[in-house]
């Protein structure tokens, strides 16, 4: 090994040099011989020991290198270098002494650093092509191979430097820079902020992911209580309603999955999220959502449950208020109702008739049928919803997020279908009127929304549609779900059930 030869020579030479030179890194010591010797190599000038090294090859190289620069330049360089110590390691004591005004005092070199510094100088001279990183690796390996006797000179020199350092800086205290901890803190803070920023989007995406999960997902979502059973749903306890955007975040994190990029993420359980709290963030973010974008995800059937609509469609569908065609838009309008009043209007026309009917009719059954014709085109008319479990199932898929979870609490089996049937306009209409308190600012935007508006009305606009998110809302639906079996019955019951849960469980921020 060519490399080893110089190293072995170095150790011998260093033993000599170390005893002679008080500090291998002392620039003043190095100033003695190097300059007069006229050696043009800068590195050698700074190292007294290196002057003692055999200079066969290095000298030849120096000759060729020196030719490149005029003598005056070389002399100027060596002159400058005389007073400057290039050691990467803590500077020699004297240099430190001169730079005491500098705030940072370097630590004294340890034995390995003494060795590495001297060896790097020597090798850098002899093998200028060596990459510094490779050089360092090799020096480390060699150091490990050295035996105690070979290491002794370096150990002694390091001790001498330490003693000297202590003299020069009696009050010196090693204070490692704490940048890393700061960075970690910053990173944590950044993460937190990122999460807060992400959460609204993440939530939407999660919703998207949610709605696609078909009835199975819905049944899983059923109730906050059952929630734990959800295979997809995050294991969040149902009692986290007050969490801000955090719940969504937490859900994502709990699952240990990256925030949903493609809506594949298991649904965030909005039931645990207080819609009111989410609304501001969400709404602000929602503006970026394109209703058409969501529409593409809608199944041709118009089951709003499809992820694209995120829950907008889901909700609309779940309510069965929006038509299949309308669902995408209505979903959009549900989502966007606050932001984009315009989208709702087109859907509202078909839906509007049901809405008016709904509030007035506690029976809801009769209005239901009238409403059904307009809505049937929409998405499994409400009537169909209640009447046809199969279809409603599909629609239910839409509702999967909304009703299933909440209604399913009670319905569990047919949460989707059942939810729908109860959702049928009749149910909504009776329940809706009571629900249309100020909460439901939505109603203005969504006539048809009125059905959801109780949900949407939650005052959270978008989320309101996802009533299941709001614990208060869930109960509202749950009762409906019960009645789902018998649409007519729910109509009478629904208002009370909804209202009661609303009051009892309403958790407004």
Curated annotation (Swiss-Prot):
Pfam families associated with the record: HMG_box, Sox_N
Motif annotated as 9aaTAD 1, chain positions: 275-284
Biased composition (Low complexity): 30-41
Region (Dimerization (DIM)): 63-103
GO MF, one example: DNA binding
BP term (GO), one: negative regulation of epithelial cell proliferation
Protein name: Transcription factor SOX-9
Motif (9aaTAD 2): 290-298
Renumbered residue ranges of the record's region Transactivation domain (TAC): 394-509
Free-text domain note: The transactivation domains TAM and TAC (for transactivation domain in the middle and at the C-terminus, respectively) are required to contact transcriptional coactivators and basal transcriptional machinery components and thereby induce gene transactivation.
Chain positions covered by the region annotation Disordered: 1-67, 160-273, 330-415, 479-509
Organism per entry: Pan troglodytes
Biased composition (Pro residues): 341-376
Main localization, broad class: nucleus
Ranges where the record places region Transactivation domain (TAM): 224-307
Region (PQA): 63-103
Role, per record: Transcription factor that plays a key role in chondrocytes differentiation and skeletal development. Specifically binds the 5'-ACAAAG-3' DNA motif present in enhancers and super-enhancers and promotes expression of genes important for chondrogenesis, including cartilage matrix protein-coding genes COL2A1, COL4A2, COL9A1, COL11A2 and ACAN, SOX5 and SOX6. Also binds to some promoter regions. Plays a central role in successive steps of chondrocyte differentiation.
Subcellular location per the Swiss-Prot or TrEMBL entry: Nucleus
Record's keyword annotation contains NAD: no
Compositionally biased region (Polar residues): 42-52, 380-415, 485-509
């Amino acid at each position: 090994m060519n490399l080893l030869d110089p190293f072995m020579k170095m150790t011998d030479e260093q033993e000599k040099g170390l005893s002679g030179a008080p500090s291998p890194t002392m620039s003043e010591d190095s100033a003695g011989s190097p300059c007069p010797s006229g050696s043009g190599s800068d590195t050698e000038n700074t190292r007294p020991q290196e002057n003692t090294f055999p200079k066969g090859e290095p000298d030849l190289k120096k000759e060729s290198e020196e030719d490149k620069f005029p003598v005056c330049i070389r002399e100027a360089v060596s002159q400058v270098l005389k007073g400057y110590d290039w050691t990467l390691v803590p500077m020699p004591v004297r240099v430190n002494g001169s730079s005491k005004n500098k705030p940072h005092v370097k630590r004294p070199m340890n034995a390995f650093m003494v060795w590495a510094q001297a060896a790097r100088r020597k090798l850098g001279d002899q093998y200028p092509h060596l990459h510094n990183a490779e050089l360092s690796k090799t020096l480390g390996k060699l150091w490990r191979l050295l035996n105690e006797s070979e290491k002794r000179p370096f150990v002694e020199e390091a001790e001498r430097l330490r003693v000297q350092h202590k003299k020069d800086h009696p009050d010196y205290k090693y204070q490692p820079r704490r940048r890393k901890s700061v960075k970690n803190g910053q990173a944590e803070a950044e993460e937190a902020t990122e999460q807060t920023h992400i959460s609204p989007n993440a939530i939407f995406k999660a919703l998207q992911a949610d709605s696609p999960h078909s009835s199975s997902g819905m049944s899983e979502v059923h109730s906050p209580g059952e929630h734990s059973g959800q295979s997809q749903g995050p294991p969040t306890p149902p009692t986290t309603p007050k969490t801000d955007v955090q719940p969504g975040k937490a859900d994502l994190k709990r699952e240990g999955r990256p925030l949903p990029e493609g809506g594949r993420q298991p649904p965030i359980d909005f039931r645990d999220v207080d819609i009111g709290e989410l609304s501001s963030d969400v709404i602000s973010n929602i503006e970026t959502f394109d209703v058409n974008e969501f529409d593409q995800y809608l199944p041709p059937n118009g089951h709003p449950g499809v992820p694209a609509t995120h829950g907008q469609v889901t909700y609309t569908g779940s309510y069965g208020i929006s038509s299949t065609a309308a669902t995408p838009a209505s979903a959009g309008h549900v989502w966007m109702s606050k932001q984009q009043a315009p989208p709702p209007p087109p859907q509202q026309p078909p839906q509007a008739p049901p809405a008016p009917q709904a509030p007035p009719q506690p029976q809801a059954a009769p209005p239901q049928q009238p409403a059904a014709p307009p809505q049937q085109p929409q998405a499994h008319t409400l009537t169909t919803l209640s009447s046809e479990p199969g279809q409603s199932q599909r629609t239910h898929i839409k509702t999967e997020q909304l009703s299933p979870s909440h209604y399913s609490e009670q319905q569990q089996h047919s949460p989707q279908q059942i939810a729908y049937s109860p959702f049928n306009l009749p149910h909504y209409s009776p329940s809706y009127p009571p629900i249309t308190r100020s909460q439901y600012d939505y109603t203005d935007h969504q006539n048809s929304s009125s059905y959801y508006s109780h949900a949407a009305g939650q005052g959270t606009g978008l989320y309101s549609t996802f009533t299941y998110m709001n614990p208060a809302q869930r109960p509202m639906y749950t009762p409906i779900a019960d009645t789902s079996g018998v649409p007519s019955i729910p109509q009478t019951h629904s208002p009370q059930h909804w209202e009661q849960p609303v009051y009892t469980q309403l958790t407004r921020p």
